[in-house]
Amino acid sequence: MRMLKKGSKGPDVKTLQRKLGISADGVFGPMTEKAVERFQLDKNLPVSGIVDNDMWALILNLDYAVPEEIDEDTDVKAQYFTTKYDQIIHRHYLPKGEYVEGPVNNEYIFLHHTAGNANPYRCIDHWGRDDRGRIATEFVLGGVNHRNENDEYNGVMVQAFPEGAQGFHLGKTGSGYMNRHSVGLEICSMGYLDENMKTYVGSVCAESQIIQLDEAFKGKLFWHAYSEEQIKATEKWLRYVGERDGVDIRLGLKQFIQKYGPTKGFDFIDDAYYGKVKGLLAHGNVRHGKSDCYPHPDLVDMILSL
């Protein structure tokens, strides 16, 4: 069996979780790590939170455990939920004070990408440590590492603060009301690439992670590709959040694409900037200088199918 640690996912993780008697979602998150540490303490093993060969030898000799109710500090049920669209959403909340507690009624949904690496937990942790105030989106979607193609977090959806709370994620627009009544998703992606397939920080993108658009967007042809899993997860999320918050996801971006085509549809739109378009929008619809999200053909097709 392979070594497992926080961020691992797959059938081996489900086997581990069943053996430990916790809910088996197949993702090695914070609560699985705590269960591993507890097992290591019980067996007088070094407490690392990592499942190596020695620990596997002990684990595989266990009978499958019935999922147990455990104390509030380690209750795995509090760490994720499953939507009616069969999407698991993991909870990894920012510290209080790093988001607006609300309650807030959302009337807009925004798609962003992080211009960062693939780990959604690390993105949220970074927000919690920075000094920019309450800047965050409610949700972050993991992706594929652009350098080494590691897919541990690919398609993993994480919630950064409770439903009804708010983070600032748009910057300066023509509508303060829109800024305060919008829910956002950050898709983990490095964004645009230069002609040498390098990111804005100078790292080289693996060939499998590159997409070339038919038409340049914001002056860029090459981009870190959104993965198939990310696009599928985004669709499930849009349907869930649109229903949760009463936002019609067919309005806004879908209409822009139908009217102007994908390149212009993802670009700046005056009415969107002033908050006049309630529905689904891209960050670039309301900010001239933003390139998130870009019109990946599969993302465009998904939005048109809504």
Predicted regions and their residues:
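Second-shell loop/turn segments in exported
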Residues: 1-7, 22-24, 45-46, 171-172, ...
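Secretory-pathway/luminal and periplasmic proteins that interact with or process carbohydrate-rich
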Residues: 42-48, 64-68, 287-292
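Active-site-adjacent loop/helix surface patches within enzyme catalytic domains
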Residues: 82-248
